[in-house]
């Protein structure tokens, strides 16, 4: 998908119901996949996180509910960080989690991070992600050797201590970090692909990062922030 159309930097797009009829195109083929018992991966530069118009975020939430079990995984970049977003059922009072966006850090290392790539492992039948490995090339090592050397940084399931990446699993993992400061600091280290000093992100920074991970819709995210005074 070309989700850059929905980017906040494109104000002319905001009032449009379906720019370039992309939503209709996506739903057409998701309906086809559902009818034929097929699985789908969505790939785009930008996820339905902080940087797209709210109306399109709402569409993503509804789409992932409607085609739950069809969209096995979705992959994004844009933020230059290593993280996730949790999509939820907006018709559910408790905001049931329905889909996880996998957001990969960037190869060029902008934003104070090291260059990074992910190697995904998936189930051949369900097409769900079962694990992934992150590799980084550290700038401080390149400064000495003048070479780009990719080294294994972490295995996701082992690093996070999770059995899978199902939405409910990821919510439990994220919410654990409200109390487990060591786990949160480790998350920030992987978030910044190793270029992070323990204790840099605390208080307001921690609350905003966790609420952004847990809630995509602005109203829900602001409620989350209000419930966790720093």
What are these regions, as identified by a protein language model?
Residues 2-32, 36, 81-230:
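Metal-dependent phosphoesterase/phosphodiesterase active-site architecture
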Residues 5-24, 31-79:
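Active-site-proximal segments of metal-dependent phosphoesterases and phosphodiesterases across multiple
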């Amino acid at each position: 998908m070309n989700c850059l159309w929905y980017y906040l930097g494109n104000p002319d797009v905001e009032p449009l119901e379906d720019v370039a009829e992309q939503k209709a195109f996506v739903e057409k083929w998701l309906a086809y996949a559902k009818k034929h018992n097929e699985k789908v991966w969505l790939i785009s530069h930008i996820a339905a996180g902080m940087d797209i118009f709210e109306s399109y975020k709402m569409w993503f939430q509804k789409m992932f509910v409607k085609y739950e079990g069809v969209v096995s995984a979705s992959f994004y970049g844009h933020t230059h960080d290593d993280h996730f977003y949790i999509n939820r059922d907006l018709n559910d009072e408790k905001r049931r989690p329905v889909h996880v966006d996998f957001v990969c850090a960037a190869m060029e290392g902008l934003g104070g991070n090291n260059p990074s790539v992910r190697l995904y492992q998936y189930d051949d039948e369900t097409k769900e992600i079962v694990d992934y490995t992150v590799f980084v090339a550290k700038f401080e090592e390149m400064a000495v050797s003048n070479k780009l050397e990719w080294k294994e940084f972490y295995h996701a399931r082992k690093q996070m201590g999770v059995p899978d990446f199902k939405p409910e699993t990821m919510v439990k993992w994220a919410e654990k970090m409200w109390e487990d400061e060591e786990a949160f600091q480790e998350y920030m280290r992987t978030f910044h692909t190793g270029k992070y000093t323990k204790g840099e992100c605390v208080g307001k920074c921690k609350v905003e990062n966790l609420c952004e991970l847990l809630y995509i819709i602005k109203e829900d995210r602001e409620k989350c922030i209000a419930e966790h005074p720093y």
